[in-house]
Swiss-Prot record:
Principal subcellular localization: membrane
One family name in Pfam for this protein: Voltage_CLC
Protein name: Putative ion-transport protein YfeO
Organism: Escherichia coli O6:K15:H31 (strain 536 / UPEC)
Parts of the chain that traverse the membrane: 10-30, 54-74, 99-119, 120-140, 149-169, 186-206, 223-243, 258-278, 300-320, 322-342, 343-363, 371-391
Subcellular location as annotated: Cell membrane
GO MF, one annotated term: monoatomic ion channel activity
Length: 418
């Protein structure tokens, strides 16, 4: 016979697996539709019209029209496409299901149109809302927080193709006690994350690792080098943290989201012309292209890092629906490659992984997630002790510093009043 603790853990196992599978399928559906629309906008349509897809006019035009389209969705859809991600943490409170169609459409348009944001925040928001709404009907005795945790764990597992990220994130939020050990609390979320990851793996495998030269023996000087690289990435990220709420307040003085996002799309188009096509979109495929190309100089990598960081801030401040983690990883890769080009004596594995750690730490303020992203982009077990040590001064630098988020009290009134 199973112990009562084991029976308690098994109670949510089936719902957890179902939520993990559903979270992955929703992610896959959204990404597939966005991919088809992206191919239409950036491959077939310019080819039909006889225009180069990297033409400045085309880049500016598509991003401006994308901004206007997203603005129209936010202005006129029920629920205004959910909350502004610039004002929300990665895992937030459930939103009304009526806001989800507009949120999904706004996300797909942004992903396909080349906006420098990832899918993570809106997808987690959608899955939490559905899990809470459906779960409350089927199992009303289970509280909303449990459904929120299961949906976010399943989505994180699906996004990264592994339950490890969910385990790391929730190990610091689901505190154990003398009565309920931590792993009892983690059991159902890990089931959801594993189901989400395995379902994603049936359709495609998220590819984060970069072909960077293997790092061998760790030296004491490498720790100092890694700490300096992380500090540089943190400094760059804190510039974005300072800019985001100010730009957000300035742009939203116009109140009408069609104008705000249209102007935001225009600015993103201009940044895209300067940075080139590799600086567009969420950044995961583009960072693979950047590393494989090997045609950039120190100044070229620096320009890409600055453009992508600026595009991230503009997209978030404008109110585009998307997450900030994936483009931040691109910024970290560009910064790391730039620093390696500038000081070749420091291995690229150190500069890239420590830059990712620093910039993701600024964006998420989550040490485990930052370590995870650095480790999966530069997969080398020799780096793990170094990254753990470098995390310590990086965390000290950010202690008490503002988050990359707009103060909720500064949010504009609903667009119903416009």
């Amino acid at each position: 016979m199973l112990h009562p603790r084991a029976r308690t853990m098994l109670l949510l196992s089936l719902p957890a697996v179902a939520i993990g599978i559903a979270s992955s399928l929703i992610l896959i559906m959204v990404m597939k539709i966005a991919s088809v629309l992206q191919n239409l906008l950036w491959q077939r349509l310019p080819g039909t019209l006889g225009i180069a897809q990297d033409s400045p006019l085309w880049i500016i035009g598509v991003l401006t029209l994308t901004g206007i389209a997203v603005g129209l969705v936010i202005r006129f859809s029920q629920g205004h496409a959910g909350p502004d991600p610039a004002c929300e943490p990665l895992i937030g409170a459930p939103v009304p299901p009526s806001a989800l169609p507009g949120l999904i459409v706004a996300l797909i348009l942004g992903l396909a149109g080349g906006v420098s944001l990832g899918p993570e925040h809106p997808i987690i928001t959608v899955n939490i809302a559905l899990a809470v709404a459906i779960g409350a009907r089927l199992l009303p005795r289970v509280n909303r927080m449990e459904w929120t945790i299961l949906a976010s764990a399943g989505t994180i597992g699906a996004l990264f193709g592994t339950p490890v990220a969910a385990a790391l994130i929730f190990s610091q939020t689901l505190n154990g006690s003398n009565e309920v050990p931590l792993w009892d609390r983690l059991f159902a979320p890990l089931m959801a994350a594993a189901a989400g990851a395995l379902t994603t793996g049936l359709f495609f495998h998220p590819h984060f690792s970069l072909p960077i030269a293997h790092y061998g023996q760790m030296e004491m000087t490498d720790i100092l080098s890694g700490a300096i690289v992380a500090a540089i990435a943190i400094a760059a990220g804190m510039v974005a943290v300072w800019c985001l709420p100010r730009l957000h307040a300035m742009m939203h003085q116009m109140k009408n989201p069609v104008f705000v996002l249209g102007i935001g799309g225009l600015i993103l188009g201009i940044l895209g012309v300067i940075g080139g096509p590799v600086s567009l979109f969420k950044g995961l495929d583009e960072m693979q292209q950047m590393v494989a190309n090997q045609a950039f100089s120190t100044s070229g990598y620096f320009l890409l890092a600055v453009i992508k960081l600026a595009a991230l801030v503009v997209a978030a401040a404008s109110g585009f629906r998307g997450g900030r983690i994936f483009p931040a990883v691109f910024v970290g890769v560009a910064l790391g490659l730039m620093l390696h080009e500038h000081v070749p004596a420091v291995p690229a594995a150190i500069t890239v992984s420590c830059a990712i750690l620093g910039i993701v730490l600024v964006v998420t303020r989550d040490g485990w997630l930052s370590l995870f992203m650095a480790a999966v982009v530069v997969p080398n077990t020799t780096l793990l002790p170094l990254l753990c040590i470098v995390m310590l001064p990086a965390w000290l630098l950010l202690a008490g510093k503002p988050m990359m988020m707009v103060n909720r009290q500064k949010q504009q009134p609903p667009h119903d009043n416009v």
